[in-house]
Amino acid sequence: MEIIPAIDMQGGRCVRLYQGDFQRVTVYDDDPVAVAHRWVAQGAPRLHLVDLDGARSGHPVHTDIIRAIVQSVDAPVQLGGGLRSIAAVERALELGVQRVILGTAAVHDPELIRQLVQQFGDAIAIAVDARNDMAATAGWTETAAISAIDLVERMAALGVRRVIYTDIARDGTLSEPNIATTRALVRPGGPAIIASGGISTIDHLRRLAEVGVEGAIVGRALYTGDLSLSDALAAVQ
């Protein structure tokens, strides 16, 4: 199971939101590039970048920072936030991003997802962000009329091979991940699942590994020091 540090960007800084609320933001560093270097130096096998301003505006905003990270770290990067067109996905991949993550488009434009999967295959991942088990879109500001489980099934039918599942109510809270829903999403022959939201202890990581997820994205716990990256990596070796 991969341990993937999250770098969420807002206004050019590295931040964390509480339950996806843009009014409840904590700034952890003014230099996301330096943060990326720090996590990779500590052994991160991959970085999870989120362009929060992009998620709200519908188009990528932190392109220069993303480019600087991709070009200077020795680890693959996955990127989400504001990627809602073929052109936006192509630009992200041209920057050197290994994997692009789409969320809003998965709900509102499944035909786009089908086209992207056909064209880019494994480079496409889907973010299934859930509030009260229903999918959320537009930077988590809107709730759609489809459940997280149904959305994953719909994406699997389109050929999607990887899903990042986040329980918004737990994100940034240091509480615990939603093990029950995560377990329901991990199915033989289904998309690989990467878990996110509320992961803050070694026990959380071990429970997720037992469920069978491909990876775990860790954010606030790494920044507060509640969880060290070296301990997390060692726990799942």
Swiss-Prot record:
Entries under SUPFAM superfamilies matching the protein: Ribulose-phoshate binding barrel
Keywords (A to Z) from UniProt: Amino-acid biosynthesis, Cytoplasm, Histidine biosynthesis, Isomerase
Keyword Isomerase: yes
One Pfam family it belongs to: His_biosynth
GO BP term (any one): L-tryptophan biosynthetic process
Gene3D superfamilies, sorted: Aldolase class I
InterPro entries for this protein: Aldolase_TIM, His_biosynth, HisA_bact_arch, Isoase_HisA-like, Isoase_HisA-like_bact, RibuloseP-bd_barrel
Superkingdom field: Bacteria
Location in or out of the cell: Cytoplasm
Pathway where this protein functions: Amino-acid biosynthesis; L-histidine biosynthesis; L-histidine from 5-phospho-alpha-D-ribose 1-diphosphate: step 4/9
Residues of the active site: D8, D129
Catalytic activity: 1-(5-phospho-beta-D-ribosyl)-5-[(5-phospho-beta-D-ribosylamino)methylideneamino]imidazole-4-carboxamide = 5-[(5-phospho-1-deoxy-D-ribulos-1-ylimino)methylamino]-1-(5-phospho-beta-D-ribosyl)imidazole-4-carboxamide
UniProt EC number: 5.3.1.16
GO molecular function per UniProt: 1-(5-phosphoribosyl)-5-[(5-phosphoribosylamino)methylideneamino]imidazole-4-carboxamide isomerase activity
Family stated for the protein in its record: Belongs to the HisA/HisF family.
HAMAP family in UniProt: HisA
Name of the molecule in the record: 1-(5-phosphoribosyl)-5-[(5-phosphoribosylamino)methylideneamino] imidazole-4-carboxamide isomerase
Taxonomic path: Bacteria, Bacillati, Chloroflexota, Chloroflexia, Chloroflexales
Gene that produces this protein: hisA
